[in-house]
Regions:
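Generic non-transmembrane alpha-helical segments
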Residues: 2-6, 172-180
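C-terminal regulatory
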Residues: 22-25, 37-152, 179-185
Length: 185
């Protein structure tokens, strides 16, 4: 990260919990969230939409059998908290699949590992699985249908003055999202 090189004295702590109060009450300066539900003491700046793809381990039966989102109902679906997937075809109407996850995890990393192990099918961010798809560790399912992307927000506390290092980090995150449209559009 260019930010770490520019600010070697700054301690970065990556926390993969969903507790937005950690930002509101000063434990963290900034959070990345896929929801804008927050208190009036926080600012949520829109960064873009995280591209998601549907993936499965190549040895899983679904890799050869799933041709349409409706086919997913017959398999174990893994979730990172959601119970609905919305699919948009290249042409035509969208389709919503409501499901009861066979397994639900509170973070993408765990869902990713479970998918790699063949536990089931998951909708995961493309940035997380791009290399696995290229190396044939995961198979992309129904590529003619796009999973509805998740909106991404940068959340931080309202203040009268923001330190330069925080402004720089905000700028670098915004720039990264703008220049990596295959992940965040």
């Amino acid at each position: 990260l260019q930010f770490i090189a520019a600010y070697p004295q700054v301690k970065l702590e990556l926390c993969f919990e969903q507790n937005i109060q950690d930002v509101e009450f000063g434990k963290f300066d900034l959070a990345l969230r896929t929801s804008i539900a927050h208190s009036d003491n926080l600012i949520a700046r829109y960064l873009g939409r995280i591209r998601h793809v549907l993936v499965v381990a190549p040895a899983h039966p679904a890799a050869a059998e799933v041709r349409h989102p409706d086919d997913l109902r017959h398999y174990r679906l893994l979730s990172s908290g959601e119970t609905q997937w919305v699919f948009e075809p290249l042409a035509g109407d969208s389709l919503t699949l409501t499901f009861e996850p066979a397994l639900c995890s509170s973070n993408y990393a765990t869902t990713h590992l479970l998918t790699l192990s063949g536990t089931g099918i998951a909708s995961l961010p493309y940035y997380l699985v791009e290399e696995d798809i290229a190396q044939h560790k995961l198979t992309l399912l129904v590529p003619q249908w796009q999973c509805y992307p998740h909106e991404l927000y940068m959340v931080y506390a309202k203040q009268s003055h923001y330190p330069k290092k925080l402004r720089d980090l905000q700028h670098k995150l915004q720039t990264w999202c703008e220049t990596h449209s295959k992940y965040v559009g």
